[in-house]
């Protein structure tokens, strides 16, 4: 053994070849600080051993290295710039040391080789993989960019255009694509990976392969003429500006970094990369996007705990009520390997449900995600039925009938009598209290809410609603089933609107008040989309939700929270509802809708709507963008904080993920609690108090006032644990 540490070891093989194997005690290898320090010492030991003629990098895991340890990021990013620079220089010295070893080096890859793992193997002379190999640099998805030499070595290895595509998109290349662009030198069978690696390395040692020429290419300036460089970088900037936009600076910064470093040798180019990395690491966007990643891991961890604690796994499911929503739920269950009975009283609804499932599977087939055989198998695992025969086989039943409490209660009561005492019943409802529906059941402990979002196949969030009688085992089993479906389940306690709809309607109320005071709805939409970053402004979102649906839900919320959410009079939603302008579903709401050539709705503004809205709108008035943002967002933010204060949702992490996954809250802002931390809670309290005269929705929750006085934040613990 040449060197041994907790996460890696170096041993001598035959013919002067040494093998450096990453072998962390955890389930995956990560390039955390400890592993980097061990790698540094291992490389020193290798350089000092005159018997070593070649080095093979390998992994004892199914994945080579999944990347840096992201849990360390927020702590590192919070350090002074000089300390952050030292960390990057330390990592750069290690990879330079690997690249400068006086003998050829080769990485044998399998599974994921991502982020810092990819940057590590870019420092070796050769890379071969098997069919499972996936290699790439996903850092821009976290609001940062490669910082261990990725923007320097990748363009010099595969060319600037291919490198910029991979880096700006945060892309991982599968084996075939990696081979095509030059990231991999060969793909071999998994059982021959190490033998092939040794053969290739031996050829390099014997100088049958020119490893020194390859190394020189990676450590020299890019070979681009001035004209080629101008065309390449101008085109890349144009494409990135179009796709990433101003709220996500990391992709554009990556292009600028590669451009600035193009004519420089390795070490000077690394200085450029380091400078830009630090700038991004200190950005609020990076804090938010890294925070989302960590929060997502937290949600997944909770789901795993639930699966472990659950009394049984879900092997079979049933959906009551077909149509688009029922078909979407059935599709998602079957796609992830849980056969499902789809029951409805109407043949045309069953047909619609099966058509929806088939349509979604066809899209998977077209994209090459599944083959025809698998598609047939998935469709066969959805059993459409007009009867309850076979319902007793279901471990979990999802009721998804019409949003009517009497109908839902009757269906749930009926099906409860047909299944055994262990079967879990759930209701897919967006507005009906779970405690109300539970009254119709003999076993309310086996019942909870399971609120899917439309379209089911795209929206990651499922709200799991705990009623006052719901058992912990019921929650665990349903959370585990939702996770098995590939969803992000978040548990909330029962209240009107649960969590997502409860916090959405104060946002709509803020929007309605602005219109009452003379704001133009198109201007509000423009500001909330382009400046705040929502995928849709409030008027457009109401059209998509459905004005009729929103009108009904608004009444439910007003009844549930009369102090804050009762209407003071007719509003824009009422005016459109009375005019039967229901939004996208019937072609007219705030906007007019037509269908484009691809069958997708296309919106346009029409003056006709102004006459309908005139009685509920004040005299036209201009508001500056910041006022529009503050007046729409403060009611939502206050309601989110109240939900945490009241225990409707358990943590800031879960609330922020529900907002991002359920409502499309701008990811670069990280959710309401991350947003509050970013702008400063004391600053928010002062800002919100300016609008106190607008009513109860604008009153700052006591929790925020206390935190402002104490100078605390919601994510201080997450940052401290990373230090």
Swiss-Prot record:
EC number, as in UniProt: 4.2.1.17, 5.1.2.3, 5.3.3.8, 1.1.1.35
Entry keywords, A to Z: Fatty acid metabolism, Isomerase, Lipid degradation, Lipid metabolism, Lyase, Multifunctional enzyme, NAD, Oxidoreductase
Residues reported to bind NAD(+): 325, 344, 401-403, 408, 430, 454
Residues bound to substrate: 296, 501, 661
Pathway(s) annotated for this protein in UniProt: Lipid metabolism; fatty acid beta-oxidation
Region annotation (Enoyl-CoA hydratase/isomerase) ranges: 1-189
Any single Pfam family the record assigns to this protein: 3HCDH
Catalytic reaction annotation: a (3S)-3-hydroxyacyl-CoA + NAD(+) = a 3-oxoacyl-CoA + NADH + H(+); a (3S)-3-hydroxyacyl-CoA = a (2E)-enoyl-CoA + H2O; a 4-saturated-(3S)-3-hydroxyacyl-CoA = a (3E)-enoyl-CoA + H2O; (3S)-3-hydroxybutanoyl-CoA = (3R)-3-hydroxybutanoyl-CoA
Site residues, Important for catalytic activity: 119, 139
InterPro entries linked: 3-OHacyl-CoA_DH_CS, 3-OHacyl-CoA_DH_NAD-bd, 3HC_DH_C, 6-PGluconate_DH-like_C_sf, ClpP/crotonase-like_dom_sf, Enoyl-CoA_hydra/iso, FA_oxidation_alpha_subunit, FadB
Family stated for the protein in its record: In the N-terminal section; belongs to the enoyl-CoA hydratase/isomerase family.
Quaternary structure and partners: Heterotetramer of two alpha chains (FadB) and two beta chains (FadA).
Name of the molecule in the record: Fatty acid oxidation complex subunit alpha
Lineage, opening ranks: Bacteria, Pseudomonadati, Pseudomonadota, Gammaproteobacteria, Vibrionales
Gene designation: fadB
């Amino acid at each position: 053994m040449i060197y041994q540490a907790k996460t890696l070891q170096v041993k001598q093989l035959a013919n002067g070849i040494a093998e450096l194997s990453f072998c962390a005690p955890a389930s995956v290898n990560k390039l955390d600080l400890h592993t980097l320090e061990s790698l540094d010492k291992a490389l020193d030991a290798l350089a000092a051993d005159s018997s070593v003629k070649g080095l093979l990098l390998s992994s004892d895991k199914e994945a080579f290295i999944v990347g840096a340890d992201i849990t360390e990021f927020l702590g590192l990013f919070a350090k002074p710039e000089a300390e952050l620079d030292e960390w990057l220089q330390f990592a750069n010295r290690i990879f330079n040391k690997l690249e400068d070893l006086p003998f050829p080096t080769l990485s044998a890859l399998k599974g994921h080789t991502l982020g810092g793992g990819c940057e590590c193997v870019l420092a070796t002379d050769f890379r071969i993989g098997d069919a499972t190999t996936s290699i790439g640099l996903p850092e821009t998805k976290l609001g940062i960019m490669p910082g261990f030499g990725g923007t320097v070595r990748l363009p010099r290895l595969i060319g600037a255009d291919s490198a910029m595509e991979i880096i700006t998109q945060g892309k991982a290349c599968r084996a075939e694509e990696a081979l095509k662009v030059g990231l991999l030198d060969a793909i071999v069978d998994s059982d021959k990976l190490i033998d092939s690696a040794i053969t290739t390395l031996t050829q390099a040692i014997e100088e049958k392969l020119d490893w020194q020429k390859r190394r020189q290419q990676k450590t020299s300036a890019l070979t681009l003429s001035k004209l080629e460089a101008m065309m390449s970088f101008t085109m890349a900037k144009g494409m990135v500006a179009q796709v990433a936009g101003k709220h996500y600076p990391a992709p554009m910064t990556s292009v600028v970094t590669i451009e600035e470093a193009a004519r420089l040798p390795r070490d000077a180019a690394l200085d450029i990369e380091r400078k830009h990395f630090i700038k991004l690491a200190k950005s609020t966007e990076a804090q938010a996007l890294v925070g989302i990643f960590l929060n997502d891991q937290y949600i997944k961890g909770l789901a795993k705990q639930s699966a472990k604690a659950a009394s049984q796994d879900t092997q079979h499911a049933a959906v009551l009520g077909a149509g688009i929503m029922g078909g979407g739920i059935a599709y998602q269950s079957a796609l992830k390997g849980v056969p499902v009975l789809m029951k409805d009283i109407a043949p045309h609804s069953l047909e619609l449900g099966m058509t929806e499932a088939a349509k979604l599977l066809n899209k998977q087939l077209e994209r090459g995600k599944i083959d025809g055989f698998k598609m047939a198998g998935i469709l066969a695992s959805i059993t459409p039925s007009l009867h309850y025969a076979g319902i007793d086989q279901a471990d979990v039943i999802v009721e998804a009938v019409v949003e009517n409490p009497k109908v839902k209660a009757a269906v749930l009561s009926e099906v409860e009598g047909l299944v055994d005492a262990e079967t879990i019943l759930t209701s897919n409802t967006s507005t009906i209290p779970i405690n109300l529906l539970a009254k119709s059941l003999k076993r309310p402990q086996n019942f909870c809410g399971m609120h899917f979002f439309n379209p089911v196949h795209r929206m990651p969030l499922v709200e799991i609603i705990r009623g006052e009688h719901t058992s912990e085992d019921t929650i665990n089993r349903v959370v585990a089933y939702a996770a098995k479906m590939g969803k992000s389940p978040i548990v909330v306690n029962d209240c009107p609107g649960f969590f997502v709809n409860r916090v959405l309607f104060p946002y709509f109320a803020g929007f309605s008040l602005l219109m009452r005071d003379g704001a133009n709805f198109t201007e509000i939409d423009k500001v909330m989309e382009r400046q705040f970053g929502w995928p849709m402004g409030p008027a457009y979102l109401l059209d998509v939700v459905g004005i009729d649906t929103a009108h009904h839900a608004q009444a439910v919320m007003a009844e549930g929270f009369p102090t804050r959410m009762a209407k003071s009079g007719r509003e824009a939603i009422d005016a459109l509802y009375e005019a039967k302008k229901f939004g996208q579903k019937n072609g007219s709401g705030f906007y007019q809708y037509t269908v484009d050539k691809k069958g997708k709705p296309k919106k346009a503004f029409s003056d006709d709507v102004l006459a309908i809205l005139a009685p509920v709108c004040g005299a036209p008035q201009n508001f500056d963008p910041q006022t529009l943002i503050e007046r729409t967002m403060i009611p939502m933010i206050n309601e989110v904080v109240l939900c945490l204060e009241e225990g409707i949702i358990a943590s800031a992490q879960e609330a922020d993920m529900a907002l991002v996954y359920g409502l499309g809250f701008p990811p670069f802002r990280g959710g309401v609690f991350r947003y509050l931390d970013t702008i400063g809670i004391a600053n928010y309290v002062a800002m919100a108090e300016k609008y106190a005269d607008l009513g109860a929705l604008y009153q700052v929750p006591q929790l925020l006032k206390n935190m402002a006085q104490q100078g605390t934040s919601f994510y201080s613990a997450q940052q401290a644990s990373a230090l």
